[in-house]
């Protein structure tokens, strides 16, 4: 009797797995039927990219969200813009699409409606990520001759990151360089409270928040890596710092830290893209530039900001003072919270620097620079997937 129950259980399990595979194959055919002439036909939204041979999911997000993320996000964006056409719905849609709290002099203040703007940009970035990966970077890497499916996915992911970090590093540099607190850490805390800002500064700050909120989602859309929890902690701390610095009127230090961190990020993403294209030697040289930029920006410049926060910030601001209607939101608990978040970020930086040192040692030993955080990009079911698609 027990053997018969075991056989029935095994049969039911096998049937369930077969049904899952059939669903994935049918959905894959619908999503990729337009590209049959390409040797690797699966688009980056194809469900087979997120499922192992035995039917196990390789990512944490629901399968339908991975497959239809572009369509879902574009539909939400279209609905928001359609609401602008309705006089009764327009007031509800405007905070998501446009900046709020414009002042008579052209500057912008702050308020609860500001929470809508970064939420909208989470949706925009999710759709933009899929579009730019699938219709810009994927055709490029295929035309380059790359046929390893995992390498194609990694190249497209890094291409999206490179594009974002490069654009917003230049934008952050422009805002930082044209300010009166450029290269002067003590001026980051002068003129407190920093309540009003230009439209460019406000858009930059809130869009950055939207990007980092979306990065938390991306962690669950991509295959988990070795440093998943470090990345998750980094994204949470980054979002908390952006929200607190914006809400408690410390805008300048937020601009400085975002600018500092974006520098090494776009160099790292660019180096990985070159590695996936086969430029091993150039990648090694670029890795040296990345290490130099990392040490300079995250261990030197960021440490200078930390020193001012710990030793001089309360004195520069004028002491602890809580007067919310007038924008003074700086008491001891808030100050301690900022210090804890900044030193948590510093701890993560040192953990990653330890990984960088390991890679640097391998490079000096004659090996190629490889990301110790990633899984093996060289092993893939390339042959079987190609045969299935022909």
Curated annotation (Swiss-Prot):
Sites bearing Phosphoserine, chain numbering: 372, 374
Pfam families associated with the record: TRAM_LAG1_CLN8
GO molecular function: sphingosine N-acyltransferase activity
Single GO biological process annotation from the record: ceramide biosynthetic process
Residue numbers spanned by region Disordered: 367-390
UniProt catalytic activity: a fatty acyl-CoA + sphing-4-enine = an N-acylsphing-4-enine + CoA + H(+)
EC numbers on record: 2.3.1.24
Membrane spanning residue stretches: 63-83, 117-137, 155-175, 199-219, 231-251, 276-296, 336-356
Top-level class of the enzyme under EC nomenclature: transferase
Subcellular location: Endoplasmic reticulum membrane
Keywords, comma-separated and alphabetical: Endoplasmic reticulum, Glycoprotein, Lipid biosynthesis, Lipid metabolism, Membrane, Phosphoprotein, Transferase, Transmembrane, Transmembrane helix
TLC domain sequence ranges: 153-365
Any one of the GO CC terms: endoplasmic reticulum membrane
Glycosylated residues (UniProt): 26
Membrane topology recorded in Swiss-Prot or TrEMBL: Multi-pass membrane protein
InterPro entries named among the record's database cross-references: Lag1/Lac1-like, TLC-dom
Similarity field: Belongs to the sphingosine N-acyltransferase family.
Function: Component of the ceramide synthase complex required for C26-CoA-dependent ceramide synthesis. Facilitates ER-to-Golgi transport of GPI-anchored proteins. Involved in the aging process.
Protein name (Swiss-Prot/TrEMBL): Sphingosine N-acyltransferase lag1
Organism field: Schizosaccharomyces pombe (strain 972 / ATCC 24843)
Name of the gene encoding the protein in the UniProt record: lag1
